[in-house]
């Protein structure tokens, strides 16, 4: 008991603290009339006395007006309202009798995010909104608000929960699709009208407010009961549970993947390495390759030219090249006969008698090398060559390179008469004097190429290439000429574009009747394609099933055109883009929905009490109806029972809630029909017979601003039935057949949902929280929850009443 009292106290304090006692928190309040700064200079409205004197009241007159919040003011409103799921609309009003008008409208282009409307034509209050699934919805609340009397109206929205209070009485309470307040930039706010031309409210408004808080209706009616928690609070708790469930599933999946990776890592050691000339180097390892310093970085070899220092050599040594190394090092020297020799160098000396003596620099002195004899030569003496480093002669053309040379990277060995020398390959330059090491010459950067105009020079190892620029073709290795891609059909123009050749390229221009950048051209239909039609050629629309016409503007009446054959117990009802076989009076659907109406079965009016037979007669059920029979020998009155009241046989009356319908009692049967319109009768009721109103002022302009309708005309616009009545357009939701099934889908460009058996095709489900799903990680999922399938990045799964439905997100795949 104590906990219940504490909870109630908390709810009262929480609900009241922001609303009254200290007044409404300004950060939660949008005072519309004050913020719009209506005054004497505002066309179409004027200040008048209100229900009370505490705030200003304004009369919205039957004249052209534009009561719209400025862009800055509207954005101030929306900053408070955007992405909020708990708010209340409050208004005190006195609406002119029979007027149908918009109280306030928040819309962007053709999308009504929040619009409150009162129809005096049909005696109902309507709320138009968009749900989180971006579908338009309309809730209709039958109530006479346009009666020239003062009323206080509040509409509280808490997530998917609506409560309508009128004059501090709860009139309606509903669960609906959750409204979306994700208002885009550029959204407009209108008061007393939908736009400049439609939805004019006529009457007085006072205290127009939006309170962004729970149970805002207590600001208008402090004595009303409060509920705790609100529907939005409950939705928040459910959402948190789903989020925690999703976090648990994702954490479990990450842990599983981490364990798998750890197991694999335990079995191997991975390190990025580099391989050069058969040798493998570890990450960050550096080495010298010829005349370059190289490093292994992230598995890639990066080399830079080696900068050789000048060695400071001691006495009896000098800088010299060493085999296998790029830079000079200090080597021992010998002085002999006025010349300098490096360690290991040899020199011959011939005596006066012609005897050859061979010396070698060793340990800083020239030492005698013992002769080991020379091989016999197979050439004439005149073709024998004396060498400076050997006492043995060789024949002309001797291959010194085959003995030994020090030619390294990009260098080749060449034979001279008496020795071998190194020479750089074509396209390379020497890195040192003996040409043992060479580097590539960048002919392109140094301008040492022969590429002519219309080409681009590309350097290659030891050479270069001349590449043709885009739009040119090759003449020879060094030159290119202009290429006509249009003639050779080597362009990227769309099939519905014209190709124009230019210097170095081409231009694409869409053909007349098509629009785009030339590479992509789409057909253009000047009047547009309505009802989901697609423009497939210039001013040619491909219409979806159920529509026809130049712009797909005409609904095909499948019922009158003979396309449909409904069961004898059903009537064919045409709908935009579709049709429906609706059970005739006296029949109802048995729950086994059939498109042709075969599921219609007889209603037992007698057993269910749905008959009008008076107490002195007996009801007999018939197929599709009933009969009121008088017992044998009894004199029956033939009276009827209608709405719980006795109507005498032959009596005629007008329905209380529909002044345009006339009913009569005939021998126990009640028959109702619309009033017959006699336009010749000067006293004809123009409300019931608007077609009898010839005044031009009673005509209406279609929402597109192009079509003019006479009073009484009807049409369908955006899944709403619209009617012109004495100059005012009133639209209400198109009546849809009852969908008695677990899964339903609203096809694109249609107005009414259809039943489907596959839950994965359904966009509307009768959620059953007792039906859960077990995902691939054995995690229990509630109905309505969604998750990314384990092991994937773009497969989204959803639990639908115990069924798991998965689909791949194409946009996610493109972003990978």
UniProtKB/Swiss-Prot annotation:
Residues 1-21 form the signal peptide. The keyword Repeat applies. Glycans are attached at residues 53, 225, 293, 298, 517, 548, 615, 635. Keywords: Calcium, Disulfide bond, EGF-like domain, Glycoprotein, Metal-binding, Repeat, Secreted, Signal. Disulfide bonds join 401-413, 407-422, 424-438, 444-457, 451-466, 468-480, 486-499, 493-508, 510-521, 525-535, 529-541, 543-552, 559-572, 566-581, 583-600, 606-619, 613-628, 630-636. Residues 30-258 form the Laminin G-like domain. One of its GO terms (biological process) is fertilization. It is found in: Secreted. Residues 272-331, 638-693, 698-756 form the VWFC domain. It comes from the Eukaryota. GO terms for molecular function: calcium ion binding; heparin binding; protein kinase C binding. Ca(2+) binds at residues 440-441, 443, 459-460, 463, 555-556, 558, 574-575, 578, 602-603, 605, 621-622, 625. GO terms for cellular component: cytoplasm; extracellular region; extracellular space. Residues 397-439, 440-481, 482-522, 523-553, 555-601, 602-637 form the EGF-like domain. The keyword rRNA processing does not apply. It holds the Pfam family Laminin_G_2. Plays multiple roles in neural tissues, regulates neuronal proliferation, survival, differentiation, polarization, as well as axon guidance and synaptic functions. Plays an important role in axon development during neuronal differentiation through the MAPK intracellular signaling pathway. Via binding to its receptor ROBO3, plays a role in axon guidance, functions as a repulsive guidance cue for commissural axons, helping to steer them across the spinal cord midline. Required for neuron survival through the modulation of MAPK signaling pathways too. Homotrimer. Binds to PRKCB. Interacts with NICOL1; this interaction triggers epididymal differentiation. This is Protein kinase C-binding protein NELL2. It comes from Bos taurus (Bovine).
């Amino acid at each position: 008991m104590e906990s219940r009292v504490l909870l109630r106290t908390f709810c009262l304090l929480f609900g009241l603290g922001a609303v009254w006692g200290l007044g409404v928190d300004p950060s939660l309040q949008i005072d519309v009339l004050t913020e719009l700064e209506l005054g004497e200079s505002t066309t179409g409205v004027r200040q008048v006395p209100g229900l009370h004197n505490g705030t200003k009241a304004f009369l919205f007159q039957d004249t052209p007006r534009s009561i719209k919040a400025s862009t800055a003011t509207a954005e101030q409103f929306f900053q408070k309202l955007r992405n909020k799921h708990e708010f209340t609309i409050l208004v005190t009003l006195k609406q002119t009798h029979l007027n149908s008008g918009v109280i306030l409208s928040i819309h962007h282009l053709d999308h009504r995010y929040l619009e409150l409307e009162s129809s005096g034509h049909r005696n109902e209050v309507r709320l138009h909104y968009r749900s989180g699934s971006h579908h338009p919805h309309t809730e209709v609340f039958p109530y006479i608000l346009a009666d020239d009397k003062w009323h206080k109206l509040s509409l509280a929205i808490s997530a998917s929960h609506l409560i309508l209070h009128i004059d501090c009485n709860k009139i309606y309470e509903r669960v609906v699709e959750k409204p979306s307040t994700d208002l885009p930039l550029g959204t407009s706010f209108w008061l007393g009208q939908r736009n400049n031309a439609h939805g004019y409210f006529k009457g007085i408004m006072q205290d127009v407010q939006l309170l962004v808080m729970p149970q805002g209706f207590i600001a208008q009616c402090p004595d009303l009961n409060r509920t705790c928690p609100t529907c939005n609070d409950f939705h928040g708790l459910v959402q948190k549970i789903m989020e925690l469930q999703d976090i648990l599933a994702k954490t479990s999946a990450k842990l599983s993947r981490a364990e798998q990776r750890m197991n694999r890592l335990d079995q191997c050691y991975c390190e990025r390495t580099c391989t050069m000339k058969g040798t493998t180097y570890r990450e960050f390892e550096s080495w010298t390759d010829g005349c370059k310093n190289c490093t292994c970085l992230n598995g890639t070899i990066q080399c830079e030219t080696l900068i050789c220092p000048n060695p400071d050599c001691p006495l009896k040594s000098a800088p010299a090249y060493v085999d296998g190394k790029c830079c000079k090092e200090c080597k021992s020297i010998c002085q002999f006969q006025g010349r300098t020799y490096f360690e290991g160098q040899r020199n011959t000396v011939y005596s006066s008698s012609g005897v050859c003596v061979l010396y070698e620099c060793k340990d800083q002195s020239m030492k005698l090398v013992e002769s080991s004899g020379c091989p016999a030569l197979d050439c004439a003496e005149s073709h024998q060559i004396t060498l400076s480093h050997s006492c043995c002669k060789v024949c002309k053309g001797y291959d010194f390179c085959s003995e030994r040379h020090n030619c390294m990277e990009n260098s080749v060995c060449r034979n001279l008469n008496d020795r071998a020398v190194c020479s750089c390959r074509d396209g390379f330059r020497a890195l040192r004097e003996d040409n043992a090491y060479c580097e590539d010459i960048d002919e392109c950067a140094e301008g040492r190429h022969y590429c002519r105009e219309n080409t681009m020079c590309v350097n290659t190892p030891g050479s270069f290439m001349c590449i043709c620029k885009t739009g040119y073709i090759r003449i020879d290795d060094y030159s290119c000429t202009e290429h006509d891609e249009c003639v050779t059909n080597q362009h990227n123009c769309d099939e519905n574009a014209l190709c124009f050749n230019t210097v170095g390229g081409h231009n694409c221009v869409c053909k007349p009747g098509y629009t785009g950048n030339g590479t992509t051209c789409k057909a253009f239909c000047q009047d547009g394609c309505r009802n989901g039609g697609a423009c497939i050629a210039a001013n040619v629309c491909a219409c979806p099933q159920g529509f026809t016409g130049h712009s797909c503007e005409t609904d095909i009446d499948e019922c009158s055109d003979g396309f449909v054959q409904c069961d004898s117990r059903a009537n064919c009802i045409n709908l935009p883009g579709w049709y429906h076989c609706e059970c005739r009076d006296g029949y109802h659907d048995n729950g086994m929905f059939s498109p042709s109406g075969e599921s219609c079965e007889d209603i037992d009016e007698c057993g269910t009490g749905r008959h009008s037979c008076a107490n002195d007669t007996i009801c007999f059920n018939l197929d599709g109806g009933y009969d009121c029979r008088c017992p044998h020998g009894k004199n029956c009155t033939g009276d009827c029972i209608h709405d719980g009241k006795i109507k005498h046989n032959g009596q005629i009356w007008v329905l209380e809630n529909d002044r345009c319908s006339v009913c009569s009692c005939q021998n126990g049967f009640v028959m109702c029909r619309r009033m017959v319109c006699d336009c010749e009768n000067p006293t004809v009721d123009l409300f019931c017979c608007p077609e009898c109103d010839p005044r031009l002022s009673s005509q209406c302009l279609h929402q597109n601003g192009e079509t003019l309708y006479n009073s009484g005309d009807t049409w369908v616009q955006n899944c709403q039935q619209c009617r012109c009545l004495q100059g005012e357009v009133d639209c209400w939701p198109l009546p849809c057949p009852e969908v008695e099934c677990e899964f339903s889908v609203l096809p694109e460009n249609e107005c009414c949902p259809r039943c489907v058996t596959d839950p994965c095709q359904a966009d509307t489900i009768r959620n059953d929280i007792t039906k859960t799903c077990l995902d691939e990680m054995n995690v229990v999922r509630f109905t309505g929850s969604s998750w990314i399938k384990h092991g994937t990045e773009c497969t989204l799964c959803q639990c639908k009443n115990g069924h798991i439905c998965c689909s791949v997100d194409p946009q996610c795949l493109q972003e990978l």
